Amino acid sequence: MGDSQYSFSLTTFSPSGKLVQIEHALTAVGSGQTSLGIKAANGVVIATEKKLPSILVDETSVQKIQSLTPNIGVVYSGMGPDFRVLVRKSRKQAQQYYRLYKETIPVTQLVRETAAVMQEFTQSGGVRPFGVSLLIAGYDDNGPQLYQVDPSGSYFSWKASAMGKNVSNAKTFLEKRYTEDMELDDAIHTAILTLKEGYEGQISANNIEIGIIRSDREFKVLSPAEIKDFLEEVE
């Protein structure tokens, strides 16, 4: 008996021990645009492709990298609307923490809270899993941190990771290039080169997005002009 008859039931395990709706959510992530993150010695970079459905779309209106708090940013692969819901929930969680303790939420705790929301949507009736994986980058008292959260609600800390449709090539490239003592500028160059590896067409400052956080603990999304400078450095 195959898994297909279980594919519409979120809360029923198939005979092979899978929740098939989560498998489908991971397929949505795997068909999304490539995103990646690299933890450097003095910061973290997250980057993603920004392919638009039409040349008529105003590219400035599309933002795939968002800040959750002043010192934490996030990027996704998968379904954009699902990402926006999670961003809103994570920001609310961070605000509640700040209101209660009068300090910014630790990166690990915000990751844990976000993962708990995603996990809840894998065992409730009448809902479906989120069709996104997240890379969350932050800098707090524990230094630079990078986490990946998947639709199942599982999360891990990474030195460098990638997700989306070009994930295997991107991870292979990152494994070759990554070093423990990598500085942030070198990590930005590596991120651009990794995106270039599987990009169909010409990469430019307008079709990729890059977010960085340094030891000043201020998450920043780079402007097209800043991305252009880094692109010129790697060419």
Swiss-Prot record:
GO terms for cellular component: cytoplasm; nucleus; proteasome core complex, alpha-subunit complex. Its main location: cytoplasm. The keyword Isomerase does not apply. It comes from the Eukaryota. The keyword Nucleus applies. CDD domains: proteasome_alpha_type_2. One of its GO terms (biological process) is ubiquitin-dependent protein catabolic process. The proteasome is a multicatalytic proteinase complex which is characterized by its ability to cleave peptides with Arg, Phe, Tyr, Leu, and Glu adjacent to the leaving group at neutral or slightly basic pH. The proteasome has an ATP-dependent proteolytic activity. The 26S proteasome consists of a 20S proteasome core and two 19S regulatory subunits. The 20S proteasome core is composed of 28 subunits that are arranged in four stacked rings, resulting in a barrel-shaped structure. The two end rings are each formed by seven alpha subunits, and the two central rings are each formed by seven beta subunits. The catalytic chamber with the active sites is on the inside of the barrel. This is Proteasome subunit alpha type-2.
